[in-house]
């Protein structure tokens, strides 16, 4: 066995179903080499070396976010949240006109439902979109808020809307338009608590994920 196999002897025939990300490699290798992250260097990934020791008590954070607020070779303008077996995708180009986001030659898809939801345990190829399945609407609302709040907390950049080459606004994520979903079961629909549908708790709004945050007014 190589030195690394001796140092990290994964038990034979073991299987772990936790999710990890490619950006976990950097902090993991640093730990293996007993090196520290350079001062002032922000690291998105997590050290997953305990998996290689067969530490069954270790679990990486089982929520992973990706954010591509720009045009590139194989996809355009999207953000994702992976939580366990579930993955939600927000497609900015389905919410906004393509020409509003990118000045190059492209196609217009604005008007389509911008959210996608997949169960990767059953559908690793992401071919069965469950975003508009009534049975999954609450899940989508919760994951959408989780994605939006993570991006806001990270002070993420968003696509810029343009007209004739001039910036005219920002393409923020919009919550799914599911007026009947009540995620916290407090009798008040999510889009009443989050009246502007931006996924964050603004002044005068209450938390759709916390039933205790809504206090009815007594007559």
Please annotate each region the language model reported.
Residues 3, 28-36, 51-55, 133, ...:
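Structured segments of extracytoplasmic/periplasmic soluble domains
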Residues 93, 141, 199-201:
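Short, composition-biased linear "edge" segments at structural boundaries
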